[in-house]
Amino acid sequence: MHRQEYRIDVSANPSIATFIKHMCKKHLVIPRLNVGVVMINTTTAINEEWLTSIESLPTHKIFYDYVYDIIAMQCNFCIHLKKTQKENDSYISLADIDYYIIKPEEVIKLDPIKELKETLLHSFSEYRATNTKTIELAAFSSGTKINDELVNRLSFLDTELFNREYKNVKIIHSQNYETYFPFSIIAPEGNISIFMEKYTWFNSSVYFKSMLSYLKEVISDQIAEFNITKLDMEKDTPTSSAYDPKSNIVFVNDITTMCIINFFGCECQLGTYHKFNISSINTKTFHKAVNKTISEIYKAIN
C-alpha cells in the first residue's frame, strides 16, 4: 500500500487548542484546480465531468515539495492532460497528467510519480481504431491570473487553441479563491488530534513541518496586529469585537479575540457580551503558549 493513515495527539490549554485548530483551517489550505479549460474532448465524459474530477484532485500529495510556497500564495500551479487512446489503453490515471509549478521567474515541470498510475481518473470505452478517444485539457490553481504573458510561457500549450477555448469558458470560472483543507483536526477540551496520510513517494514529515513553519509565521503576524476596538457601548452597538473601558464590557465576535480572552480567564463564545477587564491580557504570554503547542505538534511528527 502506498497510503497510510496516521494521527498526532497533543494536549494543550483549551483556548490554545481551539485557536490552533481554527488557524490551521484558515491558513493551511490548498487552492483547488478550479480554472479549467478543455481544448479537445472526444471521450464519453462531457467537459463538465472532466473539469469536476480535475478540480477535486488531491494536489497536496503531488506538489508536496512546494507546499510552503503554495499555502503562502507565493506561487501557482497547473496541470496538463493530453491523451489519445491506444489499443492497449483502458483507462487514464493521474500519472498521465503533467504537473507544473508557476513562479514569477520560471515554470517548473514536476518529475513523474509512478505510483500515481494506480489512481484512476477515467475509463475508456472499448478501443476502436476508427473511433479513437482523445482528451486535452489544462487546469490552474484558484487565483491564477490567466493572461497572454502566462500563456506564452507555457510551452506545452497550443496558444491559439487554448486562447480560443478559454475565451468561451472564462465567464463561468469562479472569481472566489477556492481551497480545500488537506488534513483533519479536532480539539475537544484542549486535546488536539490531527489526522493525516502518509505516502510512500515523499517525506510526509518534512511536508507537514513546512506547513507548521508557515503557520507559526502567520500566527505571529496575526497576534502582533491584535487589537480590540474601544467604544462607548451606551452610544454605539458594536458589530466586531469591541471593549467599553467605562463598564469593562467586552463584545466578542472573532476567533482570535475569543481565544485570547478565554486564555486569560473569561468564558465566552462568539457573539456574546462579558464583564471582563482586558488589562489582564498579555498577548506575548498567549503567543508563547501557542508556539509551545505548535512545537509539541512538530516534535510528535514521525
Swiss-Prot record:
Its main location: virion. InterPro entries: DNA-dir_RNA_pol_35kDa_poxviral. It is an enzyme of class 2 (transferase). It is found in: Virion. One of its GO terms (molecular function) is DNA-directed RNA polymerase activity. Keywords: DNA-directed RNA polymerase, Nucleotidyltransferase, Transcription, Transferase, Virion. It catalyses: RNA(n) + a ribonucleoside 5'-triphosphate = RNA(n+1) + diphosphate. It comes from the Viruses. One of its GO terms (biological process) is viral transcription. Coiled coil: none annotated. Its EC number is 2.7.7.6. Signal peptide: none annotated. GO terms for cellular component: DNA-directed RNA polymerase complex; virion component. Part of the DNA-dependent RNA polymerase which catalyzes the transcription of viral DNA into RNA using the four ribonucleoside triphosphates as substrates. Responsible for the transcription of early, intermediate and late genes. DNA-dependent RNA polymerase associates with the early transcription factor (ETF) thereby allowing the early genes transcription. Late transcription, and probably also intermediate transcription, require newly synthesized RNA polymerase. The DNA-dependent RNA polymerase used for intermediate and late genes expression consists of eight subunits 147 kDa, 133 kDa, 35 kDa, 30 kDa, 22 kDa, 19 kDa, 18 kDa and 7 kDa totalling more than 500 kDa in mass. The same holoenzyme, with the addition of the transcription-specificity factor RAP94, is used for early gene expression. Belongs to the poxviridae DNA-directed RNA polymerase 35 kDa subunit family. This is DNA-directed RNA polymerase 35 kDa subunit.
